[in-house]
């Protein structure tokens, strides 16, 4: 679960972002409008830089404390304006959460303003200290795991009772971790998204986030704030963008919009709060004039298919626009309220979660209602949390935890609207003017309810859509915008032709029956009070219209809301445009929005800009179905130039839907009939159904229309079939520069629309009914999308005739602001127009534009001829009625516009009305002639096609008279024009009521301006007081400098006295020390002499003793050494003689034993020889006998002879082997003997060698001893010589000392050095050191 709490007020802007809700730790850098310490690197203007840096926070760091912090000093970029920019010192303050430092200081002010002038420091510090007391307590501990501390800290900031807090109510931007929100409300799921979130969450994550971080060129004079809270229980990546509404000095408190986006298959309730707050400090606004000004609302379309490229069109509409993401119909509920209670200013921000999710319902769609109040000052999150907890009791929310569907009870489809109404009354403050609630009536319809192909369920996504303000122009980006506009225009043509609906009364939607009773409860807002309306109404200054932005085209803040057509170009091209926009860079998006905001700031647009406002609710259904036959690659293959040009035209169209959605006043509201039919709409609410053909959509299209009493009575009175009513509702003027492209664009767009229409037959049917409720003058516009079966042709009495194939034909006149092109869906809507008081030049320009657009609306209608329109009966009345509405929408329109439209409307229907410049109307007319000819040919073909349907009737009936056909056409045209006139009358009445509401709003703005003037006076008085304080401070500074100089003089005098005393004391000490030194020297000399004599005597005695001992020791060493040498020699000689004798004896013994053994061996050899000879003789004898026997046996038996021979050969072999064995035995005997002798000899040799080695070692030892003795002898001799020399020297020194004693010169330092007491000891040391080696041998 993730949390986003972002407020921007009074030039305070801070953004909080969260990465999937893992660990939210935000680092926001404060910015000042003039005193910036954050340089804008990209040169995109001093706009808001998104400094929200998310540090990954480990789990063990979650519970650490946070404090608010801002830099110590601010660098001044420009001269300080004390009156205009007194509050500009502190802009936004940071939430820094470094991992090492979890505490932040909440000072927004210069704490170390050392770089600035002294005057600036005094005044700035004065003001900033007040703001610091007001806004930032010294330290506000914010613990992320506990919401109470946050609420207390923030409440302390916002609830300050100081005057500055009343002037500029500032709010904190706090990023709370998931623990805080879980404790605050764990079961609330809020997600701000306008369309299916699964597509945008993945494919447009970076682009949509970048839009929020776009630098805004904004004035320091006034600002609006949006408070967006975004929670997500799912594991999807949460995308939130800081929503910023910044307006110039001329912008009033504008209305807040809430649209209940019926997003199917989403498990998250949508909540987007837009808390706008004008800068109450009129004195701070340089040249502030609180006239009506345009506001920008960013429109975000649906995105469904997560596998496709997202094609969302982010467009800022001119005047007030609504976030149009409805899939079918939108209920506009407007309550223009004026709250006089001034004490509520510092209370609740107008934020509430209104989600009626029934726990028992199983409807596939989720009811997502958003709610935003207008101009409610931002307050502490403490109060917000309390309100959320209070509203929890009244609003049942089923926590889905990422389920496939967020279920809504059909019994209470819009029950939250009444709760929102109650919340409006509670949350409205002094600045609250209008509250526009756009609730979704078809919230119970799922995306897969009526589609043959299952659509992927939307995944949970959260992103806040920023509201842009005036941004500086950028010439380079303007070209890109034109190309994108043109591309989006072409895509819109291709998309609108694919809408196919098929009504059947078999299966109504689930929540359509119960919605009626609940809807009546919702529409119960109090009637606005017009008592305080004053006659003073500010007129808009003349402004130049600049190029529009594909993302933003502006609408007036008080234009009446109405239902937009499903096929309105303001909404239909948005999915395709987003597909193109995803390719673009973040910088392009930022710069586009900057240019559009600058355009909105400078252009002059009357409030009478009227669009087909039902586009805002209905387009996500049909425009996306229109894409069914358009391949995805084809949408993306358009070149950059085509994309830019299409987007430029679409921005003007989208302004109409926004204007209609926002300018609805207290009375305008949509009945429950609308929500029921929206719930029974056959169109799936999938935001991206481009891959599905219209045929597949037709298969499961189920519609069961419902009507309320007022509507049915009116239809019965008009005698019309309510199911087939086709009426042109809106033609509204727009400035020529904003809405009219060149004729070349017209030609391209017409051709593109014709091509798309020719290949895509679409069937649509819309009924628009008007109902007035009570005295509030509510406009009830209901759109029902349905298509009759092809077999049964139907005739619409109100709107004309249907074709024999059952295709209703509707005429769509183009709105002058660019939303009039309603191609190929034939789903017209009725929009309401509202004229507000404007300057004479603006009225004239709008009238001239109206006349041009009315002609264009008829001239460009012939491109629908390729759409198989069977009869001209159905066409002529519709187009004529469209021209009439164009004429009647402005009271003082030119008469030529009506004439031109009536002459051209013969055989035309407006599939896409593309505004062109008045100069370029010639080529457009020439093109329309060709289109008319083609449409006539198509009509004939269609007539031929219809003939086989009734072959029997054609054969029996006579041919139809052409005059009667013309007569019926004229009757149908007249009937349609009557209906149009009645509709226009109703529009006029409703617009009058809306104008009254606008007067209330303007009066409120005037009151606020007066209050701000009072506050400015108070601030100027305070500034004068501060200047007086500055003068006092300067006087006190001079006085302190004088006192300082006096103190310095006194200090110098005292220092001089102290120095003199010090010198006197030093001289006294020197004299005393000299006297003391002389006395001590005399004493030391006497002591030294006595001690020297003692030491001399002692040393002499020691030297004598040493000499005697040394001589005795030397003699003893010499005698002992001689004796040892003699003994060693004798021992060596004895050992040698013994060894020689032993060796001789052993040699003799060995020789004797050898000789004996040799004799014995010889004897044995002789004996063996004798034995051998005897054996040989025996063998010879035996052989002779054998021979004799052989001879005998040969004679007897040859076998026996053979055996005898074999025996003889074997005996010979045995003898040979025996001889060899004897020889080997002899050799073995000899070897054994040799081995024995060798072993004995080896042992003897080893013994002899050991003895020799021992003798050698002894000899070596003897030699070493002899050498050692010789060296010791030499050392002793040397030591004796040294001692003799030392004795001589000592004697000499003794003589010198005696001489000195006699002469008395011991005190002289030069003479004392040779007779120092340490010198006599050296001879003794030397003698001791030399005598020590003599002792060591012992």
From Swiss-Prot:
<dbReference type="GO" id="GO:0008017">
    <property type="term" value="F:microtubule binding"/>
</dbReference>
<feature type="region of interest" description="Disordered">
    <location>
        <begin position="1309"/>
        <end position="1338"/>
    </location>
</feature>
<feature type="region of interest" description="Disordered">
    <location>
        <begin position="536"/>
        <end position="585"/>
    </location>
</feature>
<keyword id="KW-0131">Cell cycle</keyword>
<keyword id="KW-0206">Cytoskeleton</keyword>
<dbReference type="GO" id="GO:0005694">
    <property type="term" value="C:chromosome"/>
</dbReference>
<keyword id="KW-0175">Coiled coil</keyword>
<dbReference type="GO" id="GO:0005737">
    <property type="term" value="C:cytoplasm"/>
</dbReference>
<dbReference type="GO" id="GO:0010758">
    <property type="term" value="P:regulation of macrophage chemotaxis"/>
</dbReference>
<keyword id="KW-0963">Cytoplasm</keyword>
<keyword id="KW-0833">Ubl conjugation pathway</keyword>
<feature type="region of interest" description="Disordered">
    <location>
        <begin position="399"/>
        <end position="421"/>
    </location>
</feature>
<dbReference type="GO" id="GO:0005634">
    <property type="term" value="C:nucleus"/>
</dbReference>
<feature type="coiled-coil region">
    <location>
        <begin position="966"/>
        <end position="1298"/>
    </location>
</feature>
<feature type="domain" description="F-box">
    <location>
        <begin position="731"/>
        <end position="774"/>
    </location>
</feature>
<feature type="compositionally biased region" description="Polar residues">
    <location>
        <begin position="1"/>
        <end position="27"/>
    </location>
</feature>
<feature type="compositionally biased region" description="Polar residues">
    <location>
        <begin position="883"/>
        <end position="910"/>
    </location>
</feature>
<feature type="region of interest" description="Disordered">
    <location>
        <begin position="788"/>
        <end position="808"/>
    </location>
</feature>
<feature type="region of interest" description="Disordered">
    <location>
        <begin position="636"/>
        <end position="695"/>
    </location>
</feature>
<comment type="subunit">
    <text>Homodimer. Binds microtubules. Interacts with kif2c, aurkb, incenp and SKP1. Probably part of a SCF (SKP1-CUL1-F-box) protein ligase complex.</text>
</comment>
<feature type="coiled-coil region">
    <location>
        <begin position="469"/>
        <end position="494"/>
    </location>
</feature>
<dbReference type="InterPro" id="IPR051293">
    <property type="entry name" value="MTUS1/CCDC69"/>
</dbReference>
<feature type="region of interest" description="Disordered">
    <location>
        <begin position="883"/>
        <end position="925"/>
    </location>
</feature>
<feature type="region of interest" description="Disordered">
    <location>
        <begin position="1"/>
        <end position="28"/>
    </location>
</feature>
<comment type="similarity">
    <text>Belongs to the MTUS1 family.</text>
</comment>
<keyword id="KW-0539">Nucleus</keyword>
<feature type="compositionally biased region" description="Polar residues">
    <location>
        <begin position="1324"/>
        <end position="1338"/>
    </location>
</feature>
<dbReference type="GO" id="GO:0030496">
    <property type="term" value="C:midbody"/>
</dbReference>
<keyword id="KW-0493">Microtubule</keyword>
<feature type="region of interest" description="Disordered">
    <location>
        <begin position="938"/>
        <end position="962"/>
    </location>
</feature>
<dbReference type="GO" id="GO:0019901">
    <property type="term" value="F:protein kinase binding"/>
</dbReference>
<comment type="function">
    <text>Regulates microtubule dynamics during mitosis by stimulating kif2c. Probably recognizes and binds to some phosphorylated proteins and promotes their ubiquitination and degradation.</text>
</comment>
<protein>
    <recommendedName>
        <fullName>Microtubule-associated tumor suppressor 1 homolog</fullName>
    </recommendedName>
</protein>
<feature type="compositionally biased region" description="Polar residues">
    <location>
        <begin position="541"/>
        <end position="555"/>
    </location>
</feature>
<keyword id="KW-0158">Chromosome</keyword>
<dbReference type="GO" id="GO:0005874">
    <property type="term" value="C:microtubule"/>
</dbReference>
<feature type="compositionally biased region" description="Low complexity">
    <location>
        <begin position="646"/>
        <end position="661"/>
    </location>
</feature>
<feature type="compositionally biased region" description="Low complexity">
    <location>
        <begin position="561"/>
        <end position="573"/>
    </location>
</feature>
């Amino acid at each position: 679960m993730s949390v986003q709490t972002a407020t921007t007020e009074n030039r305070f802007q801070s953004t909080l972002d969260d990465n999937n809700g893992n660990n939210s730790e935000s680092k926001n850098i404060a910015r000042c409008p003039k005193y910036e310490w954050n340089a804008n690197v990209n040169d995109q203007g001093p706009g808001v830089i998104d400094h929200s840096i998310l540090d990954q926070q480990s789990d063990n760091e979650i519970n650490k404390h946070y404090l608010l912090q801002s830099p110590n000093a601010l660098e001044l970029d420009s001269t300080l304006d004390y009156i205009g920019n007194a509050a500009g010192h502190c802009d936004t303050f940071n939430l820094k959460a470094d991992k090492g430092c979890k505490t932040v200081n909440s000072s927004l002010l210069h704490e170390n303003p050392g770089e600035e002038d002294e005057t600036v420091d005094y005044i700035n510090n004065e003001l900033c200290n007040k703001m610091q007391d007001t806004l930032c307590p010294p330290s506000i501990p914010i613990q992320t795991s506990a919401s109470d501390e946050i609420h207390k800290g923030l409440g302390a900031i916002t609830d300050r009772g100081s005057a500055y807090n009343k002037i500029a109510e500032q709010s904190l931007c706090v990023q709370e971790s998931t623990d805080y929100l879980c404790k605050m409300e764990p079961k609330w799921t809020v997600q701000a998204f306008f369309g299916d979130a699964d597509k945008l969450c993945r494919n447009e994550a970076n682009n949509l986030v970048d839009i929020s971080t776009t630098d805004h060129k904004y004035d320091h004079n006034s600002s609006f704030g949006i408070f967006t809270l975004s929670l997500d229980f799912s594991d999807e990546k949460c995308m939130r963008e800081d929503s910023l509404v910044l307006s110039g000095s001329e912008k009033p408190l504008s209305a807040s919009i809430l649209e209940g986006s019926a997003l199917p298959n989403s498990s998250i309730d949508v909540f987007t709060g837009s808390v706008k707050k004008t800068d109450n400090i009129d004195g701070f606004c340089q040249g502030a004039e609180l006239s009506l000004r345009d506001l920008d609302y960013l429109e975000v379309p649906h995105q469904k298919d997560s596998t496709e490229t997202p094609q969302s069109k982010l467009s800022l509409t001119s005047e007030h626009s609504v976030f149009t993401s409805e899939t079918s119909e939108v209920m506009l509920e407007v309550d223009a309220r004026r709250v006089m209670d001034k004490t509520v200013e510092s209370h609740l921000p107008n934020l509430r979660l209104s989600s009626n999710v029934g726990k028992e319902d199983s409807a596939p769609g989720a009811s997502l209602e958003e709610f935003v109040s207008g101009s409610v000052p931002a307050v502490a999150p403490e109060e917000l949390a309390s309100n959320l907890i209070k509203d929890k009791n009244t609003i049942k929310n089923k926590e889905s935890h990422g389920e496939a569907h967020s279920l809504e009870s059909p019994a209470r489809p819009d029950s939250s609207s009444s709760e929102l109404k109650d919340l409006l009354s509670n949350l409205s403050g002094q600045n609250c003017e209008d509250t526009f609630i756009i609730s979704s009536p078809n919230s119970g319809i799922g995306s897969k309810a009526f589609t043959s192909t299952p659509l992927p369920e939307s995944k949970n996504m959260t992103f806040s859509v920023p509201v842009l303000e005036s941004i500086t122009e950028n010439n380079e980006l303007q070209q890109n915008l034109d190309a994108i506009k043109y591309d989006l225009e072409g895509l819109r043509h291709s998309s609108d032709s694919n809408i196919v609906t098929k009504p059947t009364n078999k299966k109504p939607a689930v929540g359509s029956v119960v919605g009626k009773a609940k809807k009546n409860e919702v529409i119960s807002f109090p009637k606005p009070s017009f008592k305080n309306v004053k006659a003073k109404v500010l007129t808009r200054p003349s402004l130049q219209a600049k190029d529009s932005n594909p993302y933003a085209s502006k609408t007036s803040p008080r234009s009446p809301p109405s239902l937009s057509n499903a096929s309105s170009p303001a909404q239909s091209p948005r999915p395709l445009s987003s597909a193109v926009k995803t390719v673009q860079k973040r910088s392009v998006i930022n710069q586009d929005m900057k240019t559009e905001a600058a355009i909105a700031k400078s252009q002059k647009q009357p409030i009478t800009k009227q669009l087909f406002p039902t586009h805002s609710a209905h387009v996500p259904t049909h425009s996306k179905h229109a894409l069914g036959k358009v391949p995805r690659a084809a949408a993306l293959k358009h070149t950059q130039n085509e994309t830019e040009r299409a987007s430029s035209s679409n921005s003007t169209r989208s302004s109409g839907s926004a204007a209609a959605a926002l300018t609805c006043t207290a009375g305008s509201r949509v009945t429950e009939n609308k929500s029921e039919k929206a719930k029974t709409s056959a169109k799936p609410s999938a935001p991206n159904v481009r891959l599905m053909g219209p045929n597949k959509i037709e298969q499961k299209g189920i519609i069961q229309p419902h009507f309320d009493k007022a509507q049915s009575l009116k239809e019965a009175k008009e005698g019309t079939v309510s199911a087939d009513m086709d009426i042109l509702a809106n033609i509204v003027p727009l400035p020529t520069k904003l809405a009219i492209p060149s004729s070349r664009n017209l030609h391209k767009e017409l051709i593109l629309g014709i091509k798309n229409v020719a290949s895509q037959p679409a069937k649509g049917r819309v009924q628009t009914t008007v109902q007035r409720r009570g005295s509030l003058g509510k406009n009830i516009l209901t759109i029902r999308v349905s298509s009759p079966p092809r077999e049964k042709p139907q005739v619409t009495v109100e709107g004309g005739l249907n074709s024999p194939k059952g295709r209703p034909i509707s005429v769509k006149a183009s709105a002058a602001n660019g939303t009039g092109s309603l191609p190929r869906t034939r789903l017209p809507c009725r929009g309401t127009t509202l004229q507000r008081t404007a300057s004479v030049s603006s009225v004239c320009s709008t009238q001239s534009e109206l006349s041009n657009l009315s002609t264009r609306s008829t001239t460009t209608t012939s491109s629908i001829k390729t759409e198989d329109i069977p009869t001209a009966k159905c066409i002529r009345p519709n187009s004529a009625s469209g021209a009439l509405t164009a004429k009647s929408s402005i009271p003082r329109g030119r008469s030529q516009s009506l004439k031109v439209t009536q002459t051209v409307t013969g055989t035309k229907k407006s599939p896409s009305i593309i505004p062109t410049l008045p100069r370029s109307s010639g080529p457009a007319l020439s093109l329309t002639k060709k289109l008319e000819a083609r449409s006539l040919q198509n009509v004939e073909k269609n007539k031929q096609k219809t003939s086989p349907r009734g072959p029997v009737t054609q054969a029996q009936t006579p041919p139809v008279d052409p005059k009667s056909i013309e007569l019926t056409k004229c009757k149908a045209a007249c009937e349609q024009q009557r209906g149009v006139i009645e509709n226009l009358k109703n529009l006029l009445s409703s617009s009058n009521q809306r104008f009254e509401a606008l007067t209330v709003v303007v009066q409120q703005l005037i009151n606020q301006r007066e209050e701000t003037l009072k506050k400015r006076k108070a601030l100027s008085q305070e500034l004068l007081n501060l200047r007086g304080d500055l003068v006092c401070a300067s006087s006190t500074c001079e006085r302190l400098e004088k006192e300082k100089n006096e103190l310095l003089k006194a200090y110098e005098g005292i220092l001089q006295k102290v120095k003199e005393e010090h010198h006197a004391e030093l001289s006294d000490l020197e004299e005393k020390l000299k006297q003391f030194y002389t006395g001590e020297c005399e004493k030391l000399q006497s002591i030294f002499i006595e001690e020297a004599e003692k030491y001399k005597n002692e040393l002499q005695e020691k030297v004598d003793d040493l000499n005697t001992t040394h001589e005795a020791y030397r003699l003893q060493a010499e005698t002992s050494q001689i004796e040892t040498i003699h003994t060693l020699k004798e021992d060596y000689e004895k050992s040698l003689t013994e060894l020689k004798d032993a060796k001789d004896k052993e040699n003799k013994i060995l020789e004797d034993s050898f000789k004996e053994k040799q004799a014995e061996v010889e004897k044995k050899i002789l004996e063996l020889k004798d034995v051998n000879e005897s054996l040989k003789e025996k063998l010879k004898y035996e052989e002779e006998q054998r021979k004799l026997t052989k001879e005998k046996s040969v004679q007897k038996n040859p076998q026996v002879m053979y055996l005898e021979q074999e025996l003889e050969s074997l005996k010979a072999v045995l003898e040979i082997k025996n001889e060899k064995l004897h020889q080997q035995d002899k050799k073995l005997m000899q070897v054994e003997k040799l081995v024995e002798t060798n072993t004995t000899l080896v042992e003897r040799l080893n013994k002899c060698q050991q003895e020799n080695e021992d003798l050698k070692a002894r000899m070596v030892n003897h030699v070493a001893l002899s050498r050692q003795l010789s060296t010791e002898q030499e050392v002793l001799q040397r030591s004796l010589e040294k001692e003799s020399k030392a004795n001589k020297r000592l004697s000499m020194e003794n003589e010198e000392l005696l001489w000195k004693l006699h002469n008395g010169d011991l005190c002289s330092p030069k003479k004392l050095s040779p007779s120092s007491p340490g010198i006599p000891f050296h001879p003794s040391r030397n003698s001791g050191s030399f005598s020590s080696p003599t002792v060591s041998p012992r």
